[in-house]
Amino acid sequence: MRVSTTARLVLAGQAPGTRVNATGIPYNDPSGDRLRAWMNVSRETFYDESRIAIVPMGFCFPGLNAQKADLPPRRECRQLWHDGLFDLLPQLTCIVAIGRYAQDYHFARLGRPLPKSATLAEIVGDWKSHARLTPRIIALPHPSWRNNGWIKGNPWFEEKVLPRLRAEVAEAIAWKAIA
């Protein structure tokens, strides 16, 4: 977790994976490289917590299932810390909600709970209505290679959502350049 009361953008993901668990650096893996490319930011800017906060739904590595995939984030982090933490961050203008756990939490927190039946394509594809929330939410698939098929099957994601993401990121982090 990396948080500052000056960051206007928060990356809300699932939980640290195995590489992040080993290094202690969030998104310090190929998924992070892809996320930074999607956002059009350098590693230096990405890890500048005065500009970009990183708050996963789980603060610790949850372990692996039988298929060697990460287990869901542990609920106690969200239950104990998230509501109070986000109450201390009124300056946020944009939440990048990466994956369903973060999306479910943040949309519900802003009074717009997602239907259980909503698909990733429906959630991510509704980006125009999410832009009317305060703070705005941009829902993304996890930037893992495991979502390559979804990304290829939904070309509108790269054509419509990524330009919106880049614009939101640029706006949210620009304040520091002139502050």
Whereabouts are the PLM-identified features?
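A polyanion-binding, active-site-adjacent surface
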Residues: M1-A177
